[in-house]
From Swiss-Prot:
This is Phosphoribosylamine--glycine ligase. It holds the Pfam family GARS_A. Its EC number is 6.3.4.13. Binds 1 Mg(2+) or Mn(2+) ion per subunit. It catalyses: 5-phospho-beta-D-ribosylamine + glycine + ATP = N(1)-(5-phospho-beta-D-ribosyl)glycinamide + ADP + phosphate + H(+). The gene is purD. It comes from Streptococcus pneumoniae serotype 4 (strain ATCC BAA-334 / TIGR4). GO terms for biological process: 'de novo' IMP biosynthetic process; purine nucleobase biosynthetic process.
């Protein structure tokens, strides 16, 4: 069968590469993809993620069995609804179900209504009201744009002034456009963060290994928030009992809740969680795979990925299997200046061979050669599996040291929280 993956980043590279490993898959198209993906035998399709009807025509013309939707903005724009209306299968939630991600206020309302543990909060479109709420509750406090903001719409404010400034930028300075026309302001939760993903169809769901992402740009969790600078899975120091509690108190009630609201969920659900003194609580939901977590979760899948998704789409029981070997860890290499202004056009090192996988995100061929150049904020990610976090770290950082990259940067402490 032939499959289509929509998106262009490292997440989509990992999804498409894993699908191509399946025995029944002859071809995986990626729209629009990036040039680095072609090194793994993936076929790029020059159609933007916003051109739903061109993508639908392509899928029909090329006899695509089903389409896997990667990015949040495509889901929020109703790409799955459009595919379904055209009689095509797509793996991802409808626009209504994806509102769990594209409106933080909606997600909060669902959590409160169905008793899911999360931070106390207020939602505001008026700056003076937001300011009064911040001044009443004090800092630290968290200010979030209600809508999608490329993972950069969250400010963890250490002071009241910082929080007021963040609210001002979103509500009055239009920093995130319509996405910041409302803000959710919530209590700062103390604890360790982790990610929990599940494949979902309605009330049936299949939990993946836990993961831990590193959002801040620089070592020691310093600097601005990014889309994510590295991750590892599973989280070795997180007891299974915590995962079981999260499933019972968070995943189940939310999925049952959206069914009751007439928005049944199909696709990947991501729960960004924090383990507090009162147990796991929700920081946010995403309506799709995380980036960079996908790149360290999918290499742990030992079953046939394409068959697993086909079964879930067909409401059959999938046979999903994961390795229990050690840990999978990955480090993102980004353009200097990311997540703010950054340069493009830096020549990239050769693709890794053997146990270290390269997933490309912002990469394109030079105009007159096959040299890969940087073409985005996050450029590529190196991933490996080893018996321990320490061994995986050593393997990745040795490879990065040998690559001697200039004009790019990476964090040198990915996974260190897991080394006691």
């Amino acid at each position: 069968m032939k499959l289509l993956v929509v998106g262009s980043g490292g997440r989509e590279h990992a999804i498409a590469k894993k699908l191509l490993e399946s025995k029944d898959v002859e071809k995986v198209f990626v729209a629009p993809g990036n040039d680095g993906m072609t090194l793994d035998g993936l076929e790029l399709v020059n159609i933007s993620i916003s051109e739903h009807y061109k993508l639908i025509d392509f899928a029909k013309t090329n006899d695509v069995a089903w389409t896997f939707i990667g990015p949040d903005d495509a889901l929020a724009a109703g790409i799955v609804d459009d595919f379904n209306q055209a009689g095509l299968k797509a793996f991802g939630p409808t626009r209504a179900a994806a509102e769990l991600e594209w409106s933080k206020d909606f997600a909060k309302e669902i959590m409160v209504k169905y008793g899911v543990p999360t931070a106390t909060y207020g939602t505001f479109s008026d700056f003076e009201e937001a300011k009064a709420y911040i001044e009443k509750h004090g800092a630290p406090i968290v200010v979030k744009a209600d809508g999608l903001a490329l993972g950069k719409g969250v400010v963890v404010a250490e002071t009241v002034e910082q929080a007021v400034e963040a609210a001002h930028e979103m509500l009055l300075d239009n920093k995130f456009g319509d996405s910041g026309a409302r803000v959710v302001i919530e209590e700062f939760l103390e604890g360790e963060e982790f990610s929990l993903f599940a494949f979902v169809n309605g009330d049936k769901f299949y939990i993946m290994p836990t993961a831990q992402d590193h959002k801040r740009a620089y070592d020691g969790d310093k600097g601005p928030n990014t889309g994510g600078m590295g991750a590892y899975a599973p989280v070795p120091h997180l007891p299974q009992s915590v995962v079981d509690t999260a499933v019972d108190t968070i995943v189940k009630p939310v999925l049952e809740g959206v069914i009751k609201e007439g928005r049944p969920y199909l696709g990947v659900l991501y729960a960004g969680l924090i383990l507090t003194a009162d147990g796991p609580k929700v920081i946010e939901f995403n309506a799709r795979f995380g980036d960079p977590e996908t790149q360290i979760i999918l290499p742990r899948l030992t079953s046939d990925f394409a068959q697993n998704i086909t079964d879930i789409l067909d409401s059959k029981e999938p046979n999903i299997m994961w390795t229990d070997k050690g840990v999978t860890l990955g480090v993102v290499v980004a353009s200097k200046g990311y997540p703010l202004d950054y340069e493009r056009g830096v020549e990239l090192p050769a693709k890794t061979e053997g146990d270290v996988i390269t997933y490309y995100a912002g990469a394109k061929f030079a105009e007159n050669s096959r040299a890969l150049l940087s073409n985005g904020g996050r450029v590529y990610m190196l991933v490996t599996t080893a018996d321990t976090v320490k061994e995986a770290q050593a393997s990745i950082y040795q490879e990065l040291y040998q690559q001697k990259i200039e004009g790019l940067f990476y964090r040198t402490d990915i996974g260190s929280k897991a080394i006691k």
